[in-house]
Amino acid sequence: TFQQRGLRLGSMITVGNQACLGSDDAVAALLDDDRVTAIGLFLEAVRDAQQFAEVAERAAEQGVPLVALQTGRSAAGALIANSHTGSMAGRAAAYDALFARYGVATVRTPAELVETLKLLDNGGSLRGRSIVSMSCSGGEASLVADRADDTTLRFEPFSTEHTARIESTLTELVSVSNPFDYHTFMWGDRAAMGRTFGAVMDGPHDVTMLVLDAPPRPENDPASWYVAADALADAAEATGHRAVVVATLAECINEPFRAHIIERGLTPLLGIADALVALEAAATVGQHEPAPRHAPVTAPAHTALIDEASAKRRLGALGVSVPDGRVVPAGDVVSAAAEVGYPVTLKALGLTHKSEAGAVKVGLRDEVALVAALTTMPHTDAGFLVESTVTDVVAEVLVTVRRDAPIGWLVSLGFGGVMTEVWSDITHLLAPVTADDVKGALQRLRSAPLLHGFRGRPAADIEALAELVVRLTDAVVGSDIVEVELNPVLVGASGATAVDALLIVEDHS
C-alpha cells in the first residue's frame, strides 16, 4: 500500500466489481480473525445493503470498528464508478444514512482512512467528543481550534478546580485554556512536562492531543522532542487517559520518531486536519447505539405522479395533517372559500412549478382579495385548489421519504420552502425511524435554532413534527409509494401541517 504512516496493516483484500464476492464477504472473513482490530473499506457501491447491515452489526457486536471511504459521490465520480465497475455508486445521502445507522465511520480521503484506522487500532474508539489540545505555540492552538470548528469535536473549558491543578505546575506567565498553549519554559524537562501534562489529563475529557513537530534530520538534534513525547506517555500511564501525538503536517514526524511514539503506547497522527477527522470518527464509532435493521427496498419498474389534491387526500387518510381544501372550477372558488373559511390559499392545478407560474396565492383574507387573485392567476382544465391558510407558523420544514434502491427508504429533513435548494440544509435517515431519531436529525441542521425560539420567536412544536414524520414513514414503507415530498411542512407553536405535497407511486397500468 506504500503507506509510511505507522499503520499496522494485517490484510488487504480487493473484490473488484463484486461480481463474485462483495465487500461484505471480505468483512465477514476478517471478523473471523481475532487479530483484526479495525477494518477500512474503500468502496464504490454496496452490493447488497441488507448483507452489509448484517456484517456491520456483527462488527459492532465484536467491537471491531468499520471505517468507509466511499467514492462516486459526485456526479462525475458516479459516472466513473458506473463505467469502471458496472454498478452505480448511488446517492451519497443514502450511503451516509446507511453508514450512520450501523455505526460505520466515514472519511473522504485515503490519508483520513489511514489515520483513523491507526487511531482505532491503538486504543479503539472514543466514548465522547470532548478533547484537549496541548501545544507550545499559540498559533498551533488557534489552528487546531479553527480546524475543529468544522467537526463535532468540542473543546470544553477546564473547570475552576481543574484549572487550579494545572496552574500549580506552571509559572504565572502561562494562562490556562483549552486549546492549551503551555509555552516552552519547561521544554526539555521530562519531569516538569509530565507534571503539567498529567494535570491537564487528570480530568473528564475523552482524549488529549499534543501537537509536536520534530526536526527530520539527526543532525538537527531531535532529542528534546523525544522528551516531550515521553512526558506525554508518562502522563498517560499515570492517569489512564487517552493521548495522541499530532503533527501539523505529515512530514513533521519521521519514521524513527513515529516508531518511538508507538513504542511508548501512543498514536502518532500525521496532519492536524486528518487527525481531527480520525478523532471524530473514533467518537462516532464509540457513541453508536444499535438500531433496528433498516427496511429493504426495490426499485419500481414504472411510476406515476399523483396530483397535489389527490396526494393530500391520501396523506390525510394516513394521518398526516393537511389543510382543509376543495378542488373546484373557477366559478365555484368563492363558495369553496366560504366553506373552508378565510384566510384561504388559492392554487391553480395542473402546473408543475406553481410558484414560478404565479399560480399560488397565500393568506387571502376576504372575497375581494380572492377574486383579485383569481383574475391574475393562470387557468387550466384541472381547476383550482382552495385551502384554509395555516397561520400558526414558526418554521418551514422539508420532509421527504423515498425509495433509494439498492440502499433503503431514505427519510430527508431540512430547511423547507422555496429556498430549499439555496440553503441545502438537509439531513438524512434510513427507515424505520423513531421520534427520537427525527429530533436528533433536526438538531443536526444548521437551521435548528429556528425551531427553538430564535430571537424571541416562539419555539416550534417539534413533538408534532416528529410524530408527522414517523407516521408518514411508517405508512410509506412497504406501500406502493415511491416518493413523497412535503415542502413545506409548516410547524407552528402547536402542530405541524403539510401544505404542499408531491406523491409518486408505482404504475402497474
Segments the model singles out, each with a brief description of its role:
Residues 1-509:
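Catalytic-core regions of core metabolic enzymes
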